[in-house]
């Protein structure tokens, strides 16, 4: 039986990439009975019925899946933020980082529009980049005008399924065009406003870029922390995890507990204060969330 990855789903057909060829496949009837929907990104076993067609027989276990966009087995999220226009937002970046890490997806931070950074903004921007690198995140500085960082970003895509995410206007389309010029995506084509009614499923496709597969639809269009419990939130702040062993209380949430090593690290400047402030704002958001029944 042949194996491959679903790179596109459209009108009941699934397009499976296998050894450089694409097969147009249908799912077995048993999937419908079991209410299983094959997703873009699924690793599947299929039976070829001709040179170009086949039937999906089995879907391998998924590492993860996203609801919006509907895609499975995402390995990394390219979080695109602009240094300016719109201004760099640590709160939004930290929100993305929490969501991405909660799905066991590797985040890669891209700071775009570095060519627009002036002398006034430069020291602040450089400090942010240093901070996130020190925490352990991969940070790539890019510019689609000077082509800064484009080759470096390409090397990160190889062999992985990636989604691009980030607010509107940060240059996601321009960046994808720089990575693969023949795409010619219109700027703002990759819309961040995907929710057009509850039951609308946006067509998703994986594009081959730099030896990897990249979703043509932005990931994490819904930014609510709905699936994250208060107790797990500190786990998505790596610099908190490093120090939580030294907290007096096991399961310390680093809010108001005595002898908290994380708060001490914030006070002594070892953890950036904005990271802690963002954490506390997420704590409040989760606490205020209405219980689901």
Curated annotation (Swiss-Prot):
Q: Which UniProt keywords apply?
A: Cytoplasm, GTP-binding, Hydrolase, Metal-binding, Nucleotide-binding, Ribosome biogenesis, RNA-binding, rRNA-binding, Zinc
Principal localisation: cytoplasm
List the Pfam families. RsgA_GTPase (PF03193), RsgA_N (PF16745)
Q: Which CDD domains match?
A: S1_YloQ_GTPase (cd04466), YjeQ_EngC (cd01854)
- Please give the cofactor(s) recorded in the UniProt entry for this protein: Zn(2+)
* Protein purpose: One of several proteins that assist in the late maturation steps of the functional core of the 30S ribosomal subunit. Helps release RbfA from mature subunits. May play a role in the assembly of ribosomal proteins into the subunit. Circularly permuted GTPase that catalyzes slow GTP hydrolysis, GTPase activity is stimulated by the 30S ribosomal subunit.
- Extract the PANTHER family matched here: SMALL RIBOSOMAL SUBUNIT BIOGENESIS GTPASE RSGA, SMALL RIBOSOMAL SUBUNIT BIOGENESIS GTPASE RSGA 1, MITOCHONDRIAL-RELATED
> Mind telling me what this protein is named?
Small ribosomal subunit biogenesis GTPase RsgA
Q: Which organism is it from?
A: Geobacillus sp. (strain WCH70)
